[in-house]
């Protein structure tokens, strides 16, 4: 997992990088009216139009990052067709995307396309028909075929071609680190410190231990090229699983480690 704090336009250089992109785009919030009076007071036709244009900018900025054949999941918490069906139609027509149908059980009471003259598959959750607040969802596929490593069964495929962003970023690794840490590097862990932390997680040899400030995170080594590519373009808030914080001369395990699947519980008798 990598957490970033960046504008969508910052992702644009990461060409053909992601297999799947989930965009829960900012919207006019009509689906929140029942539980949030503030959402009602903020609504206006002008705000709907502002949201629609913002949503399109986000999609246009991140579309190059999606691999050919990749999946875009578009969602909002609003009802109107301007921010929903009209935007899905725009993505289809502007970028040649294929709108995908989903196998949805009839008893879910999902409402389909409300745009006159269109029949592509969308999924609208209305609170008087479904459990929960208002919600909209559509799934699209980018045209083309992605070059994948048949032996890689991970959702996010590794860099496998000379011109992939991950390998290109190797040349700009130092630049990427400056983006993340504003040019200031933290000291590395000593062998003694590393030996302590390695006992806390399973298959520790598969992880890179990254120290940032007084905390240490474990990041899968197999995705270091991808991390380097992200560092070259984005502001990284957190990379990997935060496993320990330093308190005086001691290391204190973090909550994230306790609820992870890689904790060696016997390390804490």
Show the residue positions of the predicted features.
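S-adenosyl-L-methionine
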Residues: 1-16
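Mobile active-site "lid"/loop adjacent to the S-adenosyl-L-methionine
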Residues: 19-60, 77-83
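Helix-to-beta-strand junctions that scaffold the AdoMet/dcAdoMet cofactor pocket
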Residues: 66-68
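Polybasic, low-complexity RNA-engagement segments
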Residues: 133, 143-269
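Conserved beta-strand signature within the Rossmann-like core of class I S-adenosyl-L-methionine
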Residues: 71-75
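Core SAM-dependent methyltransferase catalytic element
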Residues: 20, 121-147, 152-153
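Class I S-adenosyl-L-methionine
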Residues: 99-130
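Conserved Class I S-adenosyl-L-methionine
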Residues: 46, 85-107
């Amino acid at each position: 997992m990598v957490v970033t704090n960046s504008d969508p336009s910052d992702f644009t250089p990461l060409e053909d990088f992601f297999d799947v992109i989930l965009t829960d785009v900012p919207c006019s919030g009509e689906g929140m009216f029942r539980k949030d009076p503030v959402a009602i007071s903020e609504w206006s036709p002008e705000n709907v139009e502002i949201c629609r244009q913002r949503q399109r900018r986000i999609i246009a900025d991140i579309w190059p990052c999606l691999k050919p054949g990749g999946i875009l999941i578009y969602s909002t918490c609003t009802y109107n067709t301007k921010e929903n069906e009209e935007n899905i139609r725009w993505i289809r027509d502007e970028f040649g995307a294929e709108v995908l149908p989903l196998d949805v059980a009839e008893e879910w009471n999902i409402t389909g396309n409300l745009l006159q003259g269109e029949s592509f598959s969308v999924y609208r959750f209305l609170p008087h028909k479904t459990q929960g607040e208002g919600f909209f969802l559509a799934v699209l596929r980018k045209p083309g075929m992605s070059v994948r490593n048949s032996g890689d069964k991970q959702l996010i495929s590794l860099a496998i071609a000379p011109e992939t962003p991950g390998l290109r970023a190797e040349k700009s690794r130092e630049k990427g680190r400056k983006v993340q840490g504003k040019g200031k590097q933290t000291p590395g862990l000593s062998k003694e410190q590393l030996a302590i932390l390695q006992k806390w997680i399973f298959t520790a040899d598969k992880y890179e231990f990254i120290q940032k400030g007084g905390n240490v995170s474990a990041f899968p080594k197999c995705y270091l090229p991808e991390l380097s590519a992200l560092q070259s373009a984005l502001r990284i808030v957190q990379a990997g699983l935060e496993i320990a914080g330093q308190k005086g001369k001691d290391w204190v395990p973090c909550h994230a480690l306790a609820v992870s699947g890689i904790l060696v519980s016997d390390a804490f008798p």
